[in-house]
């Protein structure tokens, strides 16, 4: 494969994400564009390969012991940061402590809350002690926020854009672009083929699709399903689809009235015509969601929970029981996902038949992720999903994660859910583990604040001038957001 790959050239990527409020801090990265930037200049301890398999990135070998409570990670030797510093255990420990710190605003803080101690085994070995065993621990360390940064004087500089990755960051303009040149010292000779890379934010779907059709960029993500057949007619363009765990949600915050009311949440969950959304918004490029962020692509998916259907009578019953009257605001933008505004309007129309009045408020695309999502009571969102239930729950649903965008805390069900997530992680009997994850999904499905109507395929378009390996990762868009590292010009 890489034997035939051409070296050189300038790659230009167009992302439908990015905001003027973005920063280079990996801990606050919240969209595909900044993730693409971090993965161009940096490396993680582990990552999902394009085969779907979890492999060591900066880790050469690892071993769990003591009931998966103790983990020893042996780092690759001779890996250099772009400033010439050799990677060692201090860099790993200091980076992770930056995310774990008391005042940390990192989205990965909750993921790492199970770590009780990190220490140096040797210059190239890091030892982790967990408060309870977790057989999935290496998966958590592949979270895209955990780009390893160089330590200096016991600290890291999260805004430096300094890493060990295939490209050296030259410039970054938030919500506009990042530019890179090849790292001649990259530790993987079979990756990082381009001389230069440019990653652009192109929020407008039509402009983004035109950019790849006109040859201004080489690849774009988030192709609108409505345009797939038109773009396929272009002889110079390939459409690439991957099916994974990406899903679209409408999170209701339990810390904001009226969403603190169980019956109101249930009324809204029953007011959604999911199949209509899959048909009209995804045009079939996806599958039904059932208000749980776990699907058949993941282990321990609870397929015994009946598919939640549109039920106007039950929706009206729960709405009346909630005691609510008046309009319910739903703040959305197509920044969340292509067709989010249309999806919200379809939900408003189907809810009206149950006597529920939803006011769809269209928000600006720029700043949506910092001003609306995780702040307003009800909005639209997308998640790339995660390969295991443990990781997905810790990313968005446990009490201590910054990204618990439904603020699902404090209810009896949420307390039980948090207990189950901790217990399931350290459970070595897979049948018992399955029972715990199944119950956790039932609690979330019933009491949680998420409306998750659909799982969406990743759809990207690229020029036929680009070549790639037979497998393309489905854990994120753009080949796991490592297109710049893995692809080459044919």
Language model features with spans:
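Alpha-helical secondary-structure segments
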Residues: 12, 87-97, 123-129, 165-166, ...
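Detector for C-terminal structural segments
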Residues: 173, 272-300, 336-348, 369-490
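Short, low-complexity disordered leader/linker segments with a strong preference
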Residues: 1-9, 101, 117, 309, ...
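Gly/Pro-rich hinge or "lid" segments in bacterial periplasmic/extracellular proteins
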Residues: 49-53, 142-192, 196, 313, ...
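Ligand-site clamp/hinge motif
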Residues: 185-230, 349, 357
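Surface-exposed binding/hinge segments that line
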Residues: 74, 108-151
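N-terminal lobe/hinge region of extracytoplasmic solute-binding protein
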Residues: 14-66, 97, 162-163
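Aromatic- and charge-enriched surface segment that lines or borders ligand/interaction sites
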Residues: 60-105, 121, 127, 211, ...
């Amino acid at each position: 494969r890489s034997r035939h790959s051409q070296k050189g050239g300038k790659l230009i990527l167009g992302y439908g994400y990015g905001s003027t409020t973005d920063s280079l801090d990996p801990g606050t990265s919240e969209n595909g564009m900044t993730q693409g930037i971090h993965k161009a200049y940096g490396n993680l301890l582990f990552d999902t390969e394009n085969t779907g398999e979890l492999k060591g990135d900066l880790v050469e070998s690892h071993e769990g012991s003591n009931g998966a409570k103790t983990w020893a990670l042996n780092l690759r030797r001779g890996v250099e940061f772009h400033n010439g510093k050799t990677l060692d255990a201090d860099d790993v420990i200091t980076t992770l402590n930056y995310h774990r710190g008391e005042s940390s605003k990192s989205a990965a803080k909750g993921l790492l809350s199970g770590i009780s101690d990190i220490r140096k085994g040797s210059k190239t070995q890091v030892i982790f002690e967990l408060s309870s065993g977790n057989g999935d621990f290496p998966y958590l360390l592949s979270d895209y926020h955990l780009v390893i940064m160089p330590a200096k004087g016991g600290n890291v500089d999260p805004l430096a854009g300094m890493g060990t990755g295939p490209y050296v960051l030259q410039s970054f303009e938030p919500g506009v672009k990042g530019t890179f040149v090849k790292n001649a010292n990259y530790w993987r000779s079979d990756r990082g083929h381009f001389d230069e890379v440019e990653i652009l934010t192109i929020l407008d779907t039509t402009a983004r699709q035109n950019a790849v059709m006109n040859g201004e960029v080489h690849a774009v993500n988030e192709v609108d399903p409505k345009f797939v057949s038109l773009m396929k007619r272009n002889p110079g363009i390939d459409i690439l689809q991957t099916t994974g765990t990406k899903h679209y949600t409408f999170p209701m915050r339990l810390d904001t009235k009226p969403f603190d009311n169980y019956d109101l949440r249930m009324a809204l969950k029953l007011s959604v015509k999911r199949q209509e959304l899959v048909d009209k918004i995804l045009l079939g490029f996806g599958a039904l969601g059932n208000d749980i962020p776990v699907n058949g692509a993941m282990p321990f998916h609870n397929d015994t929970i009946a598919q939640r259907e549109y039920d106007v009578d039950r929706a009206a019953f729960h709405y009346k029981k909630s005691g609510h009257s008046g309009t319910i605001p739903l703040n959305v933008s197509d920044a969340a996902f292509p067709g989010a505004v249309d999806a919200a309007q379809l939900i408003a129309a189907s809810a009206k038949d149950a006597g529920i009045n939803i006011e769809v408020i269209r928000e600006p695309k720029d700043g949506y992720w910092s001003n609306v999502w995780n702040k307003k009571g009800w909005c639209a969102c997308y998640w790339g999903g995660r390969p295991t239930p443990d990781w997905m729950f810790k990313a968005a649903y446990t009490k201590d994660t910054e990204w618990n965008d439904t603020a699902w805390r404090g209810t009896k069900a949420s307390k039980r859910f948090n207990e189950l997530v901790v217990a399931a992680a350290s459970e070595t009997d897979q049948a018992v583990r399955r029972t715990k994850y199944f119950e956790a999904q039932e609690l979330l499905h019933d009491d949680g604040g998420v409306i998750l109507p659909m799982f969406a395929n990743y759809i990207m378009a690229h020029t036929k001038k680009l070549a790639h390996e037979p497998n393309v990762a489905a854990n994120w868009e753009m080949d796991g957001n490592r297109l710049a590292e893995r692809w080459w010009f044919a």
